Amino acid sequence: MSDAHYDMHKRNGYSSDEPYPEIKVLGPNKYYAELLMDDYAGISSEFTSVNQYLYHNFDLDETHRELSEMWINISITEMLHMEILAKTIRLLGGNPVYRGSTSSCGAYWNGGFVCYGNSICNRLKLDLHLEHVAINNYYKDISLIEDPYIKAILNRIILDEKLHVSLFEKAIEKYCK
């Protein structure tokens, strides 16, 4: 699969305009692969984000089409991040099964990682928090990884996550007065 595939699947308004870097690594590194497993399918991961945002969308009624569109498009962007991370983990010599690393003590992903929430406002705040945690986790990984290609990948994903923060903040401003 070419790296142009990633840009082709970007969601207008839900992904940064910056192109994704080429998905490559300096060489196999199981330690880096394990670090990325938490971003991929750990507790506060892309896999959790996808499922949390989809659930929040599924539980909406027809009167909130704008929120529904936002949650669906952000979840699709998070799926793209999962695909990018899976490819990177494979290149590093890892196996991108649905499990975390240190965040979940290596346990497989489960629906208990999702914060389901009980109202639109509560859900938006939970989603905003999840994006902040993801950004912090990516920055932590960048500080531990010495591979410039992986750093470029993570920095590019962070651009999308920061856009998601902005979208959730705007939605909170609109729906949580």
Task: List where the protein language model places each region.
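Non-heme di-metal
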Residues: M1-K177
